[in-house]
């Protein structure tokens, strides 16, 4: 049984992404704002984090920046896990704005994260997200305490979380083979 500290990345900025031609998956190159960096610096000082064995991060820029700030404070090494990425709003990577991503998230919520029988949408299902998140959790369940830096929607597929604020820590006890949690659509 492992003790995970799930930390959502700090506040990001999506300004100027289109200026660089970044859309779809390219939006995940968004860095933290100055406020986001300050949020993480406060979180990084939380004494609970000192007991962790390592930091495991999503590959997205906002998560990697968050992990780097926490690593600097704790002295822990950072591992990157591709499966720790955020929910995929558009498998075809055609969306260009936050508004379009939010519309896809509303559709995801409307259908409770699963495609109706016979239909396929652009977004990743809760079931798919849960499989990849559990794959990462299972890999690190051998450690006593681990910090995971990632994303709110993805973390909600691993343990019941109503909502996560930027740089918030949610503690989670995890054991391989445990039952799936309820996914919060709030």
Residue ranges and their predicted role:
Residues 57-61, 83, 149-153:
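Short, well-ordered beta-to-alpha junction loops that form the rim of enzyme active sites
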Residues 129-141:
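A short, acidic, amphipathic alpha-helical segment used as a generic capping/interface helix at domain edges
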Residues 48-51, 140-144:
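Glycine-rich phosphate-binding loop signature in dinucleotide/nucleotide-binding domains
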Residues 13, 63-64, 86-88, 154-156:
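Short, active-site-adjacent cap segments at secondary-structure transitions
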Residues 26-31, 72-131, 182:
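Phosphate-handling substructures
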Residues 4, 144-152:
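Generic beta-sheet signal
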């Amino acid at each position: 049984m492992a003790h995970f500290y799930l930390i959502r990345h700090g506040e990001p900025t999506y300004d100027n992404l289109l200026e660089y031609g970044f859309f779809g998956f390219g939006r995940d190159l968004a860095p933290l704002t100055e406020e986001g960096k300050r949020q993480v610096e406060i979180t990084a000082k939380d004494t609970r984090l000192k007991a962790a064995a390592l930091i495991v991060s999503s590959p997205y820029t906002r998560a990697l920046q968050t992990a780097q700030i926490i690593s600097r404070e704790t002295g822990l090494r950072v591992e990157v896990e591709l499966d720790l990425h955020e929910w995929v709003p558009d498998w075809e990577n055609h969306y260009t704005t936050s508004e379009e991503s939010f519309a896809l998230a509303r559709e995801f919520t409307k259908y409770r994260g699963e495609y109706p029988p016979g239909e396929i949408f652009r977004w990743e299902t809760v079931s798919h997200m849960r499989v990849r998140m559990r794959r990462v959790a299972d890999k690190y369940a051998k450690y006593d305490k681990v910090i995971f830096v990632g994303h709110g929607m993805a973390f909600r597929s691993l343990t019941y979380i109503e909502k996560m604020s930027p740089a918030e820590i949610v503690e989670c006890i995890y054991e391989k083979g445990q039952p799936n949690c309820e996914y919060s659509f709030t």
